[in-house]
């Protein structure tokens, strides 16, 4: 089994899509070197290498800074230095013929990707819709040996341009960990919030249609909206917040909801094409979900209650609250979430990438 180097945009604690792909690779028996964004030597020292979980190791390299990328000669020198640091760390943990994974969000690492291309099979992860024209996005695809995309609409657009090197990658939910430890009493932070609870278990930033949410909650003061973070989504008495939870504790929050609520602002093209893990995390417990009509989930319209306006979403929430506890829709949602588990993702990665020892770059 070949191993993997992951050039991450984030840090492991975010537990987002890229981190779950690392976990899926580790399930296959790959060793994964998870490279956090480089630390500028002007700002401090890189974090030391550490074990994250079985088979996954975190590493942070040192860089002079992003401004060097504005000078071609210095840019190439810094990319070569970063590559050398990464290879040294890969040798330290004994990686075998590793594939390199990267995303198009990392525009500043394009020179590093070009350097890594000389020695590695390159896997480009296209995780979100591209709502603006950026030539670097195409350059990242061109550098790759395989581009794996999650939004189905982007998959068809890219495949029409680049052919069979573009493959579809399913969104994944950590189904086993999410559902494994949900026994016991409801968390105290939830008990104080009246029912019915409609919840968006993330930070309610600009991706949500906040004016629409405010209109809905004003019209239905008996419904209580729950989000995560320090600040309420809207300044209303029936809007509530929960503290951030560890991934293994998130299931307790989801079980405490009556309805999952995803009122994304679909006037923004990026949101319209979203493939949120929050949808699948709610599905893992079978609870009904109300959402604005995200393109990727149109095929699940019989399992999701949809609406565009405040009035339509209010009707959708009421229909979701009225869904019988023994509705067959609940079992179907759970089965869909299980189909998007890390184990299923691992099987897809094994099928679509040259991970066997005998594979050649």
Regions found by a protein language model. Name each.
Residues 153, 171-175:
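Carbohydrate-associated surface elements
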Residues 244, 303-311, 318-325:
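Conserved acidic donor-binding segment of nucleotide-sugar-dependent glycosyltransferases
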Residues 175-256, 279, 307-309:
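Conserved catalytic-core segment of nucleotide-activated headgroup transferases in glycan assembly
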Residues 29, 258, 286:
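A short alpha->beta transition loop at the rim of the catalytic pocket in nucleotide-sugar-dependent
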Residues 324-355:
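A charged, aromatic-enriched C-terminal amphipathic alpha-helix characteristic of glycosyltransferases
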Residues 87-91, 115, 128-147, 154-155:
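Membrane-proximal helix-turn-helix segments that form the acceptor-binding/catalytic region
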Residues 13-16, 248, 252-253, 262-283, ...:
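Nucleotide-sugar-dependent
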Residues 1-45, 217-218:
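N-terminal subdomain of nucleotide-sugar transferases
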């Amino acid at each position: 089994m070949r191993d993997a180097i992951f050039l991450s945009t984030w840090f492991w604690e975010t537990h987002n899509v890229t981190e779950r792909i690392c976990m899926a690779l580790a399930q296959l028996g790959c060793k994964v070197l998870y490279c956090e964004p480089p630390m500028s030597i002007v700002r401090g020292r890189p974090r030391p290498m550490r074990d994250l979980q079985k088979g996954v190791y975190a590493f942070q390299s040192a860089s002079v800074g992003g401004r060097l990328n504005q000078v071609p000669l210095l840019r190439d020198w810094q990319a070569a230095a970063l590559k050398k640091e990464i290879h040294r760390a890969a040798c330290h943990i004994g990686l075998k013929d590793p594939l390199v994974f990267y995303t198009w969000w990392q525009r500043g690492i394009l020179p590093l990707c070009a350097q890594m291309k000389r020695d590695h099979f390159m896997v480009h992860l296209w995780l979100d819709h591209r709502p603006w024209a950026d030539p670097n996005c195409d350059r990242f695809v061109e550098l790759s040996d395989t581009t794996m995309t999650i939004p189905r609409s982007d998959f068809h657009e890219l495949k029409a341009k680049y052919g069979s090197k573009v493959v579809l990658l399913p969104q994944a939910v950590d189904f086993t960990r999410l559902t494994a430890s949900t026994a016991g009493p409801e968390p105290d932070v939830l008990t104080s919030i009246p029912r019915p609870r409609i919840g968006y278990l993330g930070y309610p930033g600009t991706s949500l249609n906040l004016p629409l949410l405010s209109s809905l909650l004003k019209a239905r003061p008996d419904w209580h909206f729950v989000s995560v973070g320090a600040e309420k989504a809207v300044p209303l008495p029936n809007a509530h917040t929960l503290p951030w939870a560890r991934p293994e504790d998130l299931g307790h929050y989801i079980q405490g909801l009556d309805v999952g609520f995803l009122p994304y602002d679909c006037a923004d093209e990026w949101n319209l094409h979203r493939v949120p893990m929050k949808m699948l995390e709610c599905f893992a417990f079978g609870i009904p979900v109300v959402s604005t009509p995200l393109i990727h989930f149109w095929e699940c319209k019989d399992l999701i209650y949809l609406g565009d306006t405040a009035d339509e979403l209010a009707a959708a929430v009421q229909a979701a609250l009225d869904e019988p506890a023994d509705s067959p829709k609940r079992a179907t949602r759970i089965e869909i979430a299980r189909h998007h588990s890390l184990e299923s993702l691992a099987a897809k990665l094994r099928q679509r990438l040259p991970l066997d020892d005998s594979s050649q770059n």
